[in-house]
């Protein structure tokens, strides 16, 4: 098990590293060369600044029972398809019961924006998001530990 962070624009990294350290779980952060990320705990891997470069590196380096942290539903779907677990930086767990709906809603929002419509953005990150991320990341790590034993 390792934690893989889609690092371009990932809030909550301090919480993720705190939980990772607590459980001695290796953390990999993938980001483009345009995002300078420094960490005393996580291994930062820089990738080219191409379209969806980080997404493809995350997907290609994810294996069964890894935990992927991403706000991208497509990356989450690829991780789930490989037998990994996925969670958003706000602490929402992606699973096989909700990923299809989330992808469909994303499609509808994109279609609406292309037609000139507006879509509502995310709310400002708050303590509830931090608490949810901490708690649900703990849940996922314990789930993987239970599967592995």
Curated annotation (Swiss-Prot):
Stored InterPro entries:
UPF0178 (IPR003791)
Q: Which domain of life is it from?
A: Bacteria
Q: Which Pfam families match?
A: DUF188
Q: Its family?
A: Belongs to the UPF0178 family.
Please report the name of this protein according to its UniProt entry: UPF0178 protein CPR_2251
- The species this protein belongs to is Clostridium perfringens (strain SM101 / Type A)
């Amino acid at each position: 098990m390792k934690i893989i962070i889609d690092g371009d624009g990932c809030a909550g990294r301090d919480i993720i590293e705190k939980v990772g350290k607590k459980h001695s779980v290796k953390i990999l952060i993938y980001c483009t060369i345009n995002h300078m990320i420094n960490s005393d705990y996580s291994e930062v891997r820089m990738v080219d600044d191409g379209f969806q470069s980080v997404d493809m590196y995350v997907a290609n380096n994810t294996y069964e029972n890894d935990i992927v942290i991403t706000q991208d539903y497509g990356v989450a779907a690829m991780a789930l398809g490989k037998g990994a677990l996925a969670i958003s930086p706000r602490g929402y767990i992606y699973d096989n019961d909700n990923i299809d709906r989330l992808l469909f809603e994303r499609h509808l929002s994109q279609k609406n924006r292309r037609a000139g419509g507006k879509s509502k953005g995310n709310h400002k990150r708050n303590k509830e998001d931090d608490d949810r991320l901490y708690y649900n990341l703990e849940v996922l790590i314990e789930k993987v530990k239970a599967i592995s034993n």
